[in-house]
UniProtKB/Swiss-Prot annotation:
Source organism of the structure: Cellulomonas fimi (strain ATCC 484 / DSM 20113 / JCM 1341 / CCUG 24087 / LMG 16345 / NBRC 15513 / NCIMB 8980 / NCTC 7547 / NRS-133)
PROSITE patterns (UniProt xref): CBM2, CBM2_A, FN3, GLYCOSYL_HYDROL_F6_1, GLYCOSYL_HYDROL_F6_2
Segments forming domain Fibronectin type-III: 484-569, 579-667, 677-765
SUPFAM superfamilies linked to this entry: Carbohydrate-binding domain (SSF49384), Fibronectin type III (SSF49265), Glycosyl hydrolases family 6, cellulases (SSF51989)
Protein name in UniProt: Exoglucanase A
Domain CBM2: 763-872
Annotated disulfide bonds: 140-202, 374-428, 770-869
Function field: This enzyme hydrolyzes 1,4-beta-D-glucosidic linkages of cellulose. Weak activity against carboxymethylcellulose, bacterial microcrystalline cellulose and barley beta-glucan. Also has weak endoglucanase activity. Hydrolyzes glucosidic bonds with inversion of anomeric configuration.
Chain's gene name: cbhA
Keyword Disulfide bond: yes
Length: 872
């Protein structure tokens, strides 16, 4: 913690005599005696967590204990939950009403009063962890935690007068001056301005983030017993140098904009509400290479050097100091959900020469992607809150804290209407394949409620997967490396290989294997005490070392080096490859015969198989490096004999393979076989006059003329002929049932039997029509559009499609609560899976982000299922 963060002087305030019920059961064991008398003015210390306990939220603890009471079938799990209930967590002020209390919980004064009581019972200083979280345009890149205040001047004014000012006034009350209040300032805000500033919503929010954070720092820093910590994201977000460096610069710019400068910030906090591991014990060296490939280049780490939060906090501390912060600035890590224990946690190194397989097998972080942030399956509770944790000197840690209370949701799995400004983020939908995650499922836990609400299903998993295991059953960590291998010797070399052998190492538990290095590059892993390094260059000198490792991932120092020189590469190869086997002829045409065979091998130390010669009789008709070849230019209705020979790089040729005979087809083949029957015929969302159909493609017989198209039938009437596997039948009557089939036909005119029929009913005509309300908020070249659609008809719409067009070339870039598409100027919004039923008289609200070229005229004509709507 920075000495610059200490106040030059402190105010002495008259403290009112207050009584409060004790909360002994909720307070951890005291660490020291209380440093100051009850009447002393607060002293701003270097590390507020040192020698102090932390506040246990009784409201959250009650939820945890209630969950434990529902685990009567698993007493051990219930006991672990009750242990968790006694741990300190932060109190979140996530909207204005949270200050006085709302349906989601008690107000700030309730918690401060309880903190006073807990400190009195503990007899030592107490840290009250508080989260300031209501910026205008909050969480501009995600949707699940969007807030109540818009990113506008009016929103910023409300943030100051209705949110920060009342909080500061309450914290400045003399009744609470003995509490050390650690305020985490606006999670996700400033990091978004580094990585997501290209998003229109973040561009809109950027000036309000800077001004809002500055205002909060100024107001709270003026209170002597408040300690300001700025959120710095986590290693999987800002760990790359291209993100970390600009972020440190941004934090410094914001600090310098405040009245007190760098002194307004007491520290930084990482991994808030995230699940990035504190440590990756089996991947402790991010510079390690596997088969000459750095492990940080794996798909999971994407060239990021920071594999865990210990790496990241040390990295960020260096950059923050370089940006102007004092070297004593402190760091916090939120360990509430980054334990990653349970049955899927790897406990020993799994060897592999493939870098992705090596990383995936040995990382404790079991997410599909480091960007999977919402209620991730498999996560567990991490280290319990702890002041000044030892062993992490480079990270300059003030404490491990639980900023995100375990059991509180990150966001809803489905779209849940609410008055908190929280929207549905598909990253919280376990059925969503996200392009942000390399087109993988999100891995989110299903059935999640809104962000911040109690999510017991996830809490159960967090407790079960805790690491360290709750209750003291975590195995004692092995920190002792094996002895250094001795006696490393190089045997007789070849032009491309060096055999190595050595004397076995010993370990306090057990040696599990050895890593073999060529220079500084890891070239192999083995459980034996010998290894042959291959793929070397002839007549080249090399130096080799070996390291021993154990199941806990401890690795010894390198052995003494062994030098060896490969032989020259002038060995004459006079041995032919093996004879190709398994030569087979495939389906012929009138002029071609496809051939395939099993690969040949060359002699040990040989020059290697270079390719194959294909013979028709005794004539070479082709060469290839593959194990297949199609002979062309043949005569129809003729029998041929083929064989294959293998050649190596030195020019040695094998004997010919066993011959295979094949006869080309005659040139007058008549196709009389129809294509296969179309399958999978499905009707999509209908309108009042149309039914969209799709089906699976048919196939034609081998040697047939090929599928030419499909005939679509309404009952027994053919209504269309198409070449694709979809068609929309139009001109239908409203509220009418229809039956459709499809037949396939080939070029020769053969027609298949009809597919299985599919039934569909057109939508009823919406007597009364529909009403649309459209609004847009524009900035620079971007805008956000909101559309409210009302069904004025007398019947529910089971599936709906809204259509409209832009007049000025606007483009939809991202949408929500509907499936959005655009073709030219025409925009279509089809219902999402969860809001497809639109009852008579009810409305649905959808929206999108878009771009414009300076003119953003609102659409004036909308249709709902093909019926024109009126503008509201």
């Amino acid at each position: 913690m920075s000495t610059l963060g200490k106040r030059a002087g402190v105010r002495r305030r008259v403290r009112a005599v207050a009584t409060a019920a004790t909360a002994t059961a909720l307070v951890a064991v005291p660490l020291t005696t209380l440093a100051t008398s009850a009447s002393a003015a607060p002293v701003h210390v270097d590390n507020p967590y040192a020698g102090a306990v932390q506040y246990v939220n009784p409201t959250w603890a009650a939820s945890v204990n209630a969950a434990a009471g529902r685990q009567s079938a698993d007493p051990a799990l219930a006991a672990k939950m009750r242990t968790v209930a006694g741990q300190p967590t932060a109190v979140w002020m996530d909207r204005i009403s949270a200050i006085t209390g709302n349906a989601d919980g008690n107000g700030l004064k309730f918690h401060l009063d309880n903190a006073v009581a807990q400190q009195k019972a503990a007899g030592v200083p107490l840290v009250f962890n508080l989260v300031i979280y209501d910026l205008p345009g909050r969480d501009c890149f995600a949707l699940a935690s969007n807030g109540e205040l818009p990113a506008t001047d009016a929103g910023l004014a409300r943030y100051k007068s209705e949110y920060i000012d009342p909080i500061a006034d309450l914290l400045d009350n003399p009744e609470y001056e003995s509490i050390r209040i650690a305020a985490t300032i606006e999670p996700d805000s400033l990091p978004n301005l580094t990585t997501n500033i290209s998003e229109p919503a973040c561009q809109q929010a950027a000036p309000y983030y800077r001004q809002g954070v500055k205002y909060a720092l100024d107001k709270l820093h003026a209170i002597p017993n408040v300690y300001n910590y700025i959120d710095i994201g986590h290693s999987g977000w800002l760990g790359w140098d291209s993100n970390a460096g600009p972020s440190a610069t941004l934090f410094a710019e914001v600090a310098k904009s405040t009245t007190a400068g760098f002194a307004s910030i007491d520290g930084f906090v990482s991994d808030v509400a995230n699940t990035t591991p504190l440590e990756e014990p089996l991947l402790s060296d991010s510079s390690l290479t596997i088969n000459n490939t750095p492990i940080r280049s794996s798909k999971f780490y994407e060239w990021n050097f920071d594999f865990d939060e210990i790496d990241y906090t040390a990295h960020m501390h260096r950059l923050l100091v370089a940006a102007g912060f004092p070297s004593s600035i402190g760091m916090l890590v939120d360990t509430s959900r980054n334990g990653w224990g349970g049955p899927n946690r790897p406990t020993s190194i799994t060897a592999s020469t493939d870098v992705n397989a090596y990383v995936d097998a040995n990382r404790v972080d079991r997410r599909v992607h480091r960007g999977a942030w919402c209620n991730p399956l498999g996560a567990g509770i991490g280290r319990f809150p702890e002041a000044t944790p030892s062993g992490y000197a480079a990270s300059h840690l003030d404490a491990f804290v639980w900023i995100k209370p375990p059991g509180e949701s990150d966001g809803a799995s489905t779209d849940i209407p609410n008055d908190q400004g929280k929207r549905f983020d598909r990253m919280c939908d376990p059925t969503f394949v996200s392009p942000k995650l390399n087109n993988q499922l999100t891995g989110a836990t299903p059935n999640a409620p809104l962000a911040g609400q109690w999510f017991e299903e996830q809490f159960v998993t967090l407790v079960k997967n805790a690491y360290p295991v709750i209750g003291g059953t975590t195995p004692v960590e092995d920190l002792v490396a094996p002895t250094v291998p001795t006696g490393l010797t190089a045997g007789t070399t070849t032009a491309t290989s060096v055999p190595l052998s050595w004397t076995a190492s010993t370990d306090n538990v057990a040696v599990t294997g050895y890593d073999v290095y060529r220079g500084t590059t890891l070239v192999g892993t083995t459980a034996a005490t010998s290894y042959t390094v291959t793929g070397l260059t002839p007549a080249t000198a090399y130096s080799f070392t070996v390291r021993a490792k154990d199941a806990a991932g401890n690795v010894s120092a390198a052995s003494a080096a062994a030098a060896a020189t490969t032989q020259s590469g002038t060995v004459t190869d006079t041995t032919a490859p093996s004879v190709p086997a398994g030569l087979t002829a495939g389906t012929t045409t009138t002029t071609t015969v496809p051939l395939s065979w099993t690969a040949s091998t060359d002699n040990a130390g040989g020059s290697g198989v270079a390719g194959y010669e294909v013979l028709r009789g005794t004539t070479v008709v082709g060469t290839t490096t593959a194990t297949s070849y199609t002979v062309t230019g043949l005569t129809a209705g003729t029998t041929y004999s083929f064989s294959v020979r293998a050649k190596d790089v030195a020019g040695n040729t094998s004997a010919a393979s066993a011959a295979v005979s094949a006869t080309t087809q005659t040139g007058t083949v008549v196709d009389t076989t129809a294509p296969s029957v179309p399958t999978g015929l499905t009707a999509g969302t209908t309108t009042t006059s149309s039914v969209p159909l799709t089906w699976t493609a048919s196939t034609d017989n081998a040697g047939g003329s090929g599928v030419a198209g499909y005939e679509v039938f309404n009952g027994t009437t053919r209504v269309a002929t198409v070449t694709s596997t979809s068609y929309t039948v139009t001109g239908l009557a409203a509220d009418t049932a229809y039956s459709f089939t499809v037949k396939a036909k080939d070029v020769a005119g053969n027609v298949s039997a009809a597919s299985a029929a599919v039934s569909a009913r057109t939508q009823a005509a919406t007597s009364g029509g529909c009403t649309v309300k459209y609004s847009a908020s524009s900035w620079n070249t971007g805008f956000t559009g909101t559309v409210e659609v009302k069904n004025n008809g007398t019947a529910a719409l089971n599936g709906w499609t809204l259509g409209f067009s832009f007049a000025d070339g606007q483009k939809v870039s991202q949408g929500w609560s509907a499936e959005w598409s655009q073709s030219g100027t025409a925009v279509t919004a089809k219902n999402a899976p969860w809001n497809g039923t639109l009852a008579a008289g009810s409305s649905v609200s959808i929206g999108f982000n878009g771009t414009h070229n300076g003119t953003n005229t609102a659409p004036t004509a909308f249709t709902l299922n093909g019926v024109a709507c009126t503008l509201g």
